[in-house]
Amino acid sequence: MMRFIATWFYIGLLKPAPGTWGSLGALPFIYIFLIIELNVLYLLIISSIVFILGWLATLIETKEKSEHDPSEIVIDEVVGQWITFTPLFIITSNEKFHTSICRNVFNININSETYSMDIILIFLSSFILFCFFDIIKPWPISWADQISTPFGVMFDDILAGIFSALCLTIILFFGLLS
């Protein structure tokens, strides 16, 4: 069961670039969360639960192994990618932001038969931002990446998600996708 969680439904076993596959594996869940109009608070609660499960799964999966962050463990990418989408959920969960930013910057109508190009651009931008920060690892992400524990495996991707979320906030606020 822990391998199933650590590899995010075995997506982490895909080659090449299992981390990228893990990040992609997070996106259908974000899409579902948008369809069911999940509140940002619930997104953060679910992300926290998956973080704790991922931490435990990583602890068990790396026990008695020489490598502290095997490439097939991608649960950290999933949580980091979900954190990247936090600004979008803040906007869609908050009526004040929803009317001012959603109407003027992008048109999200996830329940319609035709999806706006803007939601595709938001997904693409979020994915690229997270992958960028996860690969480049500027400080303090690089510092967290050096923590050779299961917490460190998870934490560097949390920071990459936070950096990506900040960039996505700027992009959405200034309408840079329009």
Located regions from the model:
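Interfacial segments of multi-pass membrane proteins
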Residues: L24-E37, F85-L88, L168
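Membrane-helix exit/interface motif
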Residues: I36, L53-K65, T86-I101, V105
